[in-house]
UniProtKB/Swiss-Prot annotation:
Record organism: Moorella thermoacetica (strain ATCC 39073 / JCM 9320)
Keyword list, A-Z: Decarboxylase, Lyase, Pyrimidine biosynthesis
Enzyme Commission identifier(s): 4.1.1.23
The protein's name: Orotidine 5'-phosphate decarboxylase
Entries under CDD domains matching the protein: OMP_decarboxylase_like
Active-site residues, as the UniProt record annotates them: K75 (proton donor)
Entry GO terms, CC: cytosol
Protein family per UniProt: Belongs to the OMP decarboxylase family. Type 1 subfamily.
PANTHER family: OROTIDINE 5'-PHOSPHATE DECARBOXYLASE
GO molecular function: orotidine-5'-phosphate decarboxylase activity
Its job: Catalyzes the decarboxylation of orotidine 5'-monophosphate (OMP) to uridine 5'-monophosphate (UMP).
Family matches, as PROSITE patterns: OMPDECASE (PS00156)
GO biological process: 'de novo' pyrimidine nucleobase biosynthetic process; 'de novo' UMP biosynthetic process
Gene: pyrF
Length: 252
């Protein structure tokens, strides 16, 4: 269970600081529109594979030029030298958070963490938060066993990868809300947990399998919530973001 001190600190954070809006959009114009509308309600914007592939580094620069913070959700998974080089490039772009796959192994994780901190120090700027992707939220127990070939329960595998990430010097992990408690027990109260698979009550689950509401995830001990379609695909994205922020503010 998360400690009382940790929960109190997270509650003190303004609601917007806990919200990462996923910019899963096909082009720069669509991203600009969302950032302009949602900046008052988002502490960070996630630039993922679709947006980065379509717009390249300009996607990151666009958010930064508007005063936003960027989570580069590119899930690097390659040999250590390649991942280290890619991580350095993201530091030079000015991202605030980035991720790599825990499945890449300890040497890859260590290389990425070292590269991020060395590059940030060379540029005389704060190092981005570096986190590891664990089990994708689109996978359930059956898919993990039959398709990926991992026999452990999802929660056990997530906790195992979270411990590996911590040992390798990373700041935290990406994991579904269902595994937050296991990660907290394994890795402690300061470990960063970024949680996708968050859906307001009554909203469409989409392709997510292991989900919670924003309030439930925060009560479990999530550090940040990644929220995409419930905000960006809503008839009124601003109203949707406001409603989620209001729900977060009620968490005690």
């Amino acid at each position: 269970m998360p400690t009382l001190m940790y929960l109190q600190e997270m509650i003190r954070m303004h609601a917007k600081d806990k919200i990462i809006v996923a910019l899963d959009v096909p082009d720069l114009a669509a991203g600009e529109k969302l950032v302009d509308r949602l900046s008052p309600y988002a502490g960070m914007f996630k630039v993922g594979l679709e947006f980065f592939t379509a717009a390249g580094p300009a996607a990151v620069r666009m958010v930064k030029e508007r005063g936003g913070r960027v989570f580069a959700d590119l899930k690097f998974h390659d040999i250590p030298n390649t991942v280290a080089g890619a991580a350095r490039a993201l530091v030079r772009l000015g991202v605030d958070m980035l991720n790599v796959h825990a499945a890449g192994g300890k040497a890859m994780l260590q290389a990425a963490a070292a590269a991020v901190r060395e590059e940030a120090a060379a540029l005389n700027r704060p190092a981005p938060v570096i986190i590891a992707v664990t089990v994708l939220t689109s996978l359930d127990r059956e898919a993990l066993r039959c398709e990926v070939g991992i026999e452990r329960e999802v929660e056990e595998q997530v906790a195992r990868w979270a411990l590996l990430a911590r040992e390798a010097g990373l700041d935290g992990v990406v994991a579904s809300p269902r595994e937050i408690r296991a990660i907290r027990e394994a890795c402690g109260p300061e470990f960063v947990i970024v949680t996708p698979g968050v859906r307001p009550a009554g909203s469409d689950r989409g392709d997510q399998r292991r989900v919670m509401t924003p309030a439930e995830a925060l009560r479990e001990g999530a550090s940040y919530l990644v929220i995409g379609r419930p905000i960006t695909a809503a008839p009124d994205p601003v109203a949707a973001a406001r409603a989620i922020a209001a729900e977060i503010e009620m968490v005690k």
